[in-house]
Amino acid sequence: MRRRRPLLTLGSLMLMGLLAVPVVDARAWELQGVKSITATTRDNQRIALGSVRFEPRGDGRVAFTVSLEPARFTDHFLSMKEFKCLDGPGEVVCHVPYPHAQPGTITPDDLAWLEHNLLFLYQLPTDFGAKLWNGLYFQLEPTEQGLRGRPQAIDLNYISAPSDTPGQPPYQPEQRDEIAPGVRWIESLTIE
């Protein structure tokens, strides 16, 4: 009569235990459907700004449409132009629509055109006129829940005229500067 080896029995039990674990759907967040755009302030207030609709295409690109919620913004007439703005404590942050034609598509590895649709400027409530050199660019990075962007400093005068290369997003990393946490009222944008 053969005796069972305890190690083999222990190994069999471990294998059975692993097989009994339920299968979990581990799909990552997808660039598909309607997602919410939310700003988080330095005092952890979350402000729903609107939504973005993602529509995958068959070629690996994803078409997008950004829709900001007008009721969340106040109108400011700056430098002969109307801006949609958020009034914060000590800082006004205004959306700056990208002013030139662009493809309206992204890929999972290149979110630049979406980032260019989420440009903002900031200024003091007492400032007169748009301070276009006070631009904010939110470089988006994937998270488990969606996309998150921290502000980077840009000069919005850079896009006052159309680019010589219209198919390439103008704000490349060399046109952007990091901003220390806590300096700007809007600390991050999320798309979830």
Can you describe what each PLM-predicted range is?
Residues 1-6:
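N-terminal secretory signal peptides that target proteins for export/translocation
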Residues 9-21:
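Bacterial N-terminal signal peptides
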Residues 22-28:
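Sec/Tat signal peptide C-region and signal peptidase I cleavage site
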Residues 28-30, 55-62, 84-91, 139-148, ...:
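A short, structured loop/turn motif at beta-sheet edges
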Residues 29-50, 62-68, 92, 143-154:
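Tryptophan-anchored aromatic micro-motifs
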Residues 60-129:
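Predominantly extracellular/secreted and cell-surface proteins with exposed
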Residues 113-146, 152:
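Acidic, glycine-rich flexible loop segments
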Residues 134-136, 144-192:
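Edge beta-strand at a domain terminus
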